[in-house]
Amino acid sequence: MKAVSIEAGERSKAKRVHGVNRGISVFDLVLRIVALVGTLASAVAMGTAGQALSFSTQIVNFEAQYDDIDAFKFFVVSNSITCVYLALSIPISIFHIIRSRAGKSRVLLIVLDAIMLVFLTSGASAAAAIVYLAHNGNTSTNWFSICQQYTDFCQRSAGSLIGSFGAMALMVLLIILSSIALSRR
């Protein structure tokens, strides 16, 4: 640390920046835990979504499950991988609380957070497009809405998008916070 002369009436700001970085690191940890819970809840909600219609016969079975649609499979996989990444990044976030001036690990987290954000966004966007079609259909291509028959399945799949889009917003905040902490170093 540089020696700086302080005139009467002035306070040193060296410890203040260190304390701000520690506060940013604590907030980073909290955001990672909340994003982890959001992605986990989204993956579990979509992965367990399924509904069979009550008028199914022995010959024809009317059933909707998440694994019938590839976009929903990708949604579950992208949320699961992001959840595992967030769990593995928590020790690094704790390390940043202890050593708030660490720089290389912050750069690594920024890059990996950005990659996971893109991965999570692509999975959530693909699932959102299918949920939109399930709710509204597409009359120009004669795709009818299935949500009048499969109400529980549609509600569960639409609800699982909430946690994923919330985690996306938190990932953006994580990237911004890490960039701010890195610039204050």
From Swiss-Prot:
BP-aspect Gene Ontology terms: cell wall organization
Keyword annotations: Cell membrane, Cell wall biogenesis/degradation, Glycoprotein, Membrane, Transmembrane, Transmembrane helix
Residues in compartment: Extracellular: 54-73, 128-160
Alphabetical list of InterPro entries matching this protein: CASP/CASPL (IPR006459), CASP_dom (IPR006702), CASPL (IPR044173)
Keyword RNA-binding in annotation: no
Membrane topology annotation: Multi-pass membrane protein
GO terms for cellular component: plasma membrane
Side Cytoplasmic, residues: 1-32, 95-106, 182-185
Glycosylation sites: N138
NCBIfam families, per database record: A_tha_TIGR01569
PANTHER family to which the protein is assigned, alphabetical: CASP-LIKE PROTEIN, CASP-LIKE PROTEIN 1U1
Job description of the protein: Regulates membrane-cell wall junctions and localized cell wall deposition. Required for establishment of the Casparian strip membrane domain (CSD) and the subsequent formation of Casparian strips, a cell wall modification of the root endodermis that determines an apoplastic barrier between the intraorganismal apoplasm and the extraorganismal apoplasm and prevents lateral diffusion.
Subunit-structure text: Homodimer and heterodimers.
Protein name: Casparian strip membrane protein 1
